[in-house]
Amino acid sequence: MRQLLGCALLAMALMTWGCEGTVTQGNGSGGDTSQGDGLNGDGVNADGLSGDVDNDLTLPPSLVGLTAIRIEPQDKTLIVTPQAPATQQYTVYGTFDDKPEADITSEVVLHVQEPSLGLFIGAKFQSVTTHGGETMVHAGVGPFSVSTPLHLKFVSNALGPETSNPLPTAPWTVFAGADTSPGLAPQLVYPNDGVMLPPNVAQLEVHWRPSGGADLFELGFHHAALDLNIYIRCTEPTSGGCVHKLEPDTYRQLAETTDGLGPVQLTIRASDEAGGLGSSATFDVEFAQEAVEGGVYYWTTSDGTAIMRFDFGDAEPNPEVFVTANDDRLDTCVGCHALSRDGKKMVMSKGGQNDGRIVFLSDVTRPENFDLNVPNQDDQDLLIQFAAWNPDGTRFAAIYGDVDNESQRNRVHFHDGNTGLRLNESIDLPFEPSHIEWSPDGKMLAMSRVGTHQTSQRPFNCGLEVMRKQGNSFGAPETVIPIQPGVNHFNPNFAPDSSFMVFSRSVCPNGDDENDECDGDSDLYAQTYAVQPQPGATPVFLARGGGPGVEDQGNKNLSDTFPRFSPFAKRQGAGRLVWVTVSSRRRFGLRGNG
């Protein structure tokens, strides 16, 4: 397998996924009570309850005759800084059927909907100092409740690393004026404009190229809920530009304040420290509403071949070697691998093309203890190239086509999910399969249909097929994407709800089906598409995720291959969001490939 230099995360919004139940948010007026659900800023009176209820029986004696409540202030915006929490005193008023409106604050319970933003001490709200965000303030007594929005805007001026050229005192004052010198405008290089990030990755670098000799910069992140500025010199010169990795606390301030609230605007301003100011273009950076879970395993050829593991959300999130070659356990490299859907088991192929000895691990927490590690190729029943697990991890399907016998190539084998051994079950096909995939709902197998045989790892001129479960077996193959001259469609992978697949598509150079850059491996011209698992379905190019970054300089041939879904769907506004990893040769800003 040729080297794949990088792994990208793509966010996909599944707007057709309905939420279980609905949450209705109103305008948060916080006005006089009326019938409602108590979550939209309006209060609730007795008529808003089902059945006949004597309100006086559920109220303290001082509130007998209460008919409605309201809260002040309404729809409040407060400023939070790392040095000082925001505070706000709230008052709740009651309307009675036999006396004037009165302050009833001491009789009600006050709380915020999002407790990570702060708490009430009596009727006084006090925020945390670590981040801002959006929440609702709720007040209630007996059958009555009232709510109002609360906006906490996080404001911070942070200083970058120290250098031999110290920052000026209060550097934010240097940037107080308007831009005066366009020649000082930096070029913002990374992150890519329009990127969405998981809030818990805790790693973000900003790359830029200075202009006009400037060496004092303001990295500004701005949003209705945030004004976060970092003042910095070019502390890490890289490829003619500058790189700054956000401190973990800064990343959390940024992500926890704005997750799920839409794009943050990133702009870099530069000063010549003599009154001249210039600004870069503005890029949008968005943080997803919910954290990405689990981790990702991937194969690398950097610094020796290995299967690597990266755990999202770790305090120190760095890739670690999971399995590597030439140690006491493995006589050669392992590359292609398949993880069970519960993340507990893994099956691997050893030796690459024309080898395919199986390595099986029933417990990924103990990678030193292989359950099955075939020493040679004598047992043809223990050779695989690609594999895919059923939903409960009790078995996996596998293919191996690096043999001369066509009937053996045209076969899907099933293996025991506890031992890794091949079962006495298989499916004979009228074509050679590769890149086997089992849907999360267990009802479909998908695969590449090989047009021109080479090896299972590098098949030419593929289409895509699916097979549907019929009772205890799978039915005849159905063509989702037919084989087409000069194009290779390969490596399907199902979304968590099995409603569609992503796959790689390569257009062959000069229409040559047998070109090395069109062999279903790390093809330079590969792009990521999505398609429903139905005959004749129309593929959709994932243009936003597949677009080039600044340093790619418009090059759209980025070797985007082997897309893999995270198994977890997350809330994102009114829809659902899932993440896809893609191997790629795209440039990591100023750091280049890899």
Model-identified regions with their sequence ranges:
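Extracytoplasmic soluble-region selector
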Residues: 23-26, 30, 40, 50-171, ...
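A generic structural signal for short, non-catalytic loop/turn and secondary-structure boundary residues
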Residues: 9, 62-64, 181
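Bacterial N-terminal signal peptides that target proteins for export
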Residues: 1-8
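C-terminal motif of bacterial Sec signal peptides marking the signal peptidase cleavage site
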Residues: 15-18
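Sequence signature of WD/YWTD-type beta-propeller architectures
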Residues: 155-594
